[in-house]
Amino acid sequence: MELLDMNSMAASIGVSVAVLRFLLCFVATIPISFLWRFIPSRLGKHIYSAASGAFLSYLSFGFSSNLHFLVPMTIGYASMAIYRPLSGFITFFLGFAYLIGCHVFYMSGDAWKEGGIDSTGALMVLTLKVISCSINYNDGMLKEEGLREAQKKNRLIQMPSLIEYFGYCLCCGSHFAGPVFEMKDYLEWTEEKGIWAVSEKGKRPSPYGAMIRAVFQAAICMALYLYLVPQFPLTRFTEPVYQEWGFLKRFGYQYMAGFTARWKYYFIWSISEASIIISGLGFSGWTDETQTKAKWDRAKNVDILGVELAKSAVQIPLFWNIQVSTWLRHYVYERIVKPGKKAGFFQLLATQTVSAVWHGLYPGYIIFFVQSALMIDGSKAIYRWQQAIPPKMAMLRNVLVLINFLYTVVVLNYSSVGFMVLSLHETLVAFKSVYYIGTVIPIAVLLLSYLVPVKPVRPKTRKEE
């Protein structure tokens, strides 16, 4: 009877039983995170965090999932215990190697594309968490002088205990879809230190309003996704009818396919945000010294309006998968820039390549993230032209702002086809159908930026007479 109910429930929302089981466990992270608040001791909180995360993993993916999770967790902890000076390096490369192996073995991208589910998505989040923990423990050996602010804030002087480490990795199912957070934040939250310390007024932030907002947002996102997805199937890209359409209709379909797919991620991240908020970990401070309004940005992984209305492609990482973008900036982008040098296209491309490999070795992922590097660099060029225009020519500046917005819309939704369909053939068929417009435009903009280099106009200071 239970199986029949699961089958009927899954059919009613157009997903498989495996996906429905995952969704139920994923939503259950909200009440489970809420109960964390009532666990009396630090040790109890760590045990509850680890046990609840492992149990939800078992219900969602089966017993083997926890065995998979143990591998990067063991790599990270062993590297910290055995050879601290290279613990971050060891965990980064071995953790990614195991993740890539799982991606290849399970062909996870194909499973997700066909509506299936497996534990590799959670393994992706977990891999980032163990890497950041190891790198921060490595940073704890270094002198503060010369460290970036993020390194100073997140570095670990002492090695976390095994139960603290397990609690951090599996915390109430937060490894399902993120957001990625730091070990130091987890420890301070558990021990009620830092911003989580009870204030002199004895005031604690109430998470309920922010949690309800996140749940309401998730419901809207799911409703929109379920409404749109039957109307814009990805299979249409290789159907003869698609090729019979005119250019504008084909490009419009690409835009709507990307727009539709994003609502699935908006839903997932809204639920994970609600879960982290209700636990208290999502608290990020007060808006002012009077402690009248709490901020809950630590749990935020997406700004929907920010993504859909981004004025520049440079803003996309600030609004989309925010915590992973932050992780990539702190642990890849900033660390491959030589001291005293500025980051350039190479650092951007290397960071996007790491992001592509993290998602899986599908051609569509690689193409998307290489495209996104071109997109961002092209957007920077347009912005430089915009800044070079004198303030008195405000109309022309606004025209370039509009051009940058349209550029971002066109290139982002064109590029996202690869992320959705994954295969090289389907990606190239879709790109060819719109004459590779999203590849040609960024390259043309970048070439033009070399031919027409500009410097921002600086306001002149008046000379004293």
UniProtKB/Swiss-Prot annotation:
Pfam families: MBOAT
Presence of the UniProt keyword DNA repair in the record: no
Record EC number: 2.3.1.-, 2.3.1.23, 2.3.1.n7, 2.3.1.n6
One GO term of the biological process aspect: glycerolipid biosynthetic process
The encoding gene: LPCAT2
Compartments, record wording: Endoplasmic reticulum membrane
Record has Lipid biosynthesis as a keyword: yes
Designated name of the protein: Lysophospholipid acyltransferase 2
Species this chain originates from: Arabidopsis thaliana (Mouse-ear cress)
